[in-house]
Amino acid sequence: MNVAILLAAGKGERMSENVPKQFLEIEGRMLFEYPLSTFLKSEAIDGVVIVTRREWFEVVEKRVFHEKVLGIVEGGDTRSQSVRSALEFLEKFSPSYVLVHDSARPFLRKKHVSEVLRRARETGAATLALKNSDALVRVENDRMEYIPRKGVYRILTPQAFSYEILKKAHENGGEWADDTEPVQKLGVKIALVEGDPLCFKVTFKEDLELARIIAREWERIP
């Protein structure tokens, strides 16, 4: 059984909106509904768990009607806490693999879901990633130090793992930027799956405007 964990518990404070960004509506759908729709259509996914804050349960329940949705789980104050809540909820389902995705990355393609899961079956863990094409610098005391671009990737989601591996990675708590970090500390090789620029995360208002433009054509994009 392959289960997608859709993280939708963030506060979206950098967006400066009264509503968390995952619940902002673009082209008739809330942001979280875009990746959710991809999971529901994907033949590679058997079930979906949506993680959000208790005060948004009713909103999610009204928007979600599908047999693939296994449940709505209360998230924590941090990303890692939310992932652990989902893993605990999933114990009774005994999934083989779980796929973790940020709801603020609305434009998820089915081919990426399938490929990340395929690579995770080979190594135990895989993530969507994008080669960096920009110049990178580290700034300290107003001095710029240039970072070589070769071998530098942006880590995206979705990320897929053996359920047992991800559960073990989180069993001692901890706070992580994403889930590949604690998994790699177990000595597990993380497979990288090439993504594309559409996998961006909506963080600022400018991102939301770009998302509106893409959403108008999303159903036509293969």
Swiss-Prot record:
Pathway the protein contributes to: Isoprenoid biosynthesis; isopentenyl diphosphate biosynthesis via DXP pathway; isopentenyl diphosphate from 1-deoxy-D-xylulose 5-phosphate: step 2/6
EC numbers: 2.7.7.60
One Gene Ontology term of the molecular function aspect: 2-C-methyl-D-erythritol 4-phosphate cytidylyltransferase activity
Transmembrane segments: none
GO CC term, one of those recorded: cytosol
UniProt xrefs under InterPro entries: IspD, IspD/TarI, ISPD_synthase_CS, Nucleotide-diphossugar_trans
Positions marked as site (Transition state stabilizer): R14, K21
Keyword tags: Isoprene biosynthesis, Nucleotidyltransferase, Transferase
Annotated site location: Positions MEP for the nucleophilic attack: R149, K201
Keyword Nucleotidyltransferase: yes
One Pfam entry name: IspD
Enzyme class: transferase
Disulfide bonds: none
Reactions catalysed according to its record: 2-C-methyl-D-erythritol 4-phosphate + CTP + H(+) = 4-CDP-2-C-methyl-D-erythritol + diphosphate
PANTHER family per UniProt: D-RIBITOL-5-PHOSPHATE CYTIDYLYLTRANSFERASE
Function: Catalyzes the formation of 4-diphosphocytidyl-2-C-methyl-D-erythritol from CTP and 2-C-methyl-D-erythritol 4-phosphate (MEP).
Similarity comment: Belongs to the IspD/TarI cytidylyltransferase family. IspD subfamily.
Listed HAMAP family: IspD (MF_00108)
The protein, known as: 2-C-methyl-D-erythritol 4-phosphate cytidylyltransferase
